Design a protein with these regions (language model features):
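Helix N-cap and loop-to-helix transition residues
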Residues: 6-8, 41, 72, 110
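Gly/His-enriched, cation/cofactor- and phosphate-binding structural elements
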Residues: 59-158
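Short glycine- and Lys/Arg-enriched binding-loop motifs that mark or flank ligand-binding interfaces
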Residues: 3, 34, 44, 48, ...
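Beta-strand segments within the central parallel beta-sheet cores of soluble alpha/beta enzyme folds
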Residues: 12-17, 102
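Active-site rim beta-loop-alpha module in soluble metabolic enzymes
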Residues: 15-77, 81
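Single conserved hydrophobic/aromatic residue that forms the stacking wall/gate
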Residues: 1-3, 7-11
């Protein structure tokens, strides 16, 4: 029988080993907070806002990078779905994504948009276990309201 501490270490070790075997994509709805944080210049934010630019950020492991710049929410959603599909197809050639991975979505503030996003993802990835939650405050304070995200996580073997 394992002690509580041993079980916690086992879980932690599994999560650490699999941290690079997942992907997160976040669509930022407004450039205001990226500008405040110094990630976008004032001129870049002004031009991007006029053009309706929605940046898509990518997190793999511990690294946050710009993934794409899209025009509008619809294009950003398509870009995120395509990126997740590509990653899943590359890692799980049998096509049974639900057997190998979980799908999650997240959002900041706009629950109505989040529910629509969830429905779109469930239609795009049938058979996958799915969860939706608000983005953590540590992320939300840097990207602002209206953000949508999608993530996939490798299932951990027991």
């Amino acid at each position: 029988v394992r002690s509580r501490r041993q079980r916690q270490m086992c879980i932690r070790d599994s999560l650490e080993a699999d941290k690079l075997d997942s992907g997160i994509y976040i669509m930022v709805d407004t450039l205001k907070y990226l500008k405040k944080g110094g990630r976008v210049t004032a001129a870049g934010a002004a031009i991007g806002t006029v053009l309706g630019i929605k940046p898509v950020l990518q997190i793999h492991g511990e690294k946050l990078d710009a993934f794409a710049k899209t025009r509008g929410v619809k294009q950003a959603k398509k870009k995120m779905i395509a990126a997740v599909r590509k990653e899943l197809e590359e890692r799980f050639q049998d096509g049974d994504f639900g057997k190998h991975a979980y799908l999650q979505s997240a959002y900041t503030k706009d629950e109505e948009a989040a529910l629509k996003w969830k429905e779109e993802l469930m239609a795009e990835f049938p058979g996958m276990e799915f969860q939706q939650d608000p983005l953590s405050l540590s992320v939300a304070c840097h990207i602002g309201a209206g953000a949508l995200a999608v993530a996939w996580t490798h299932k951990i073997d027991d």
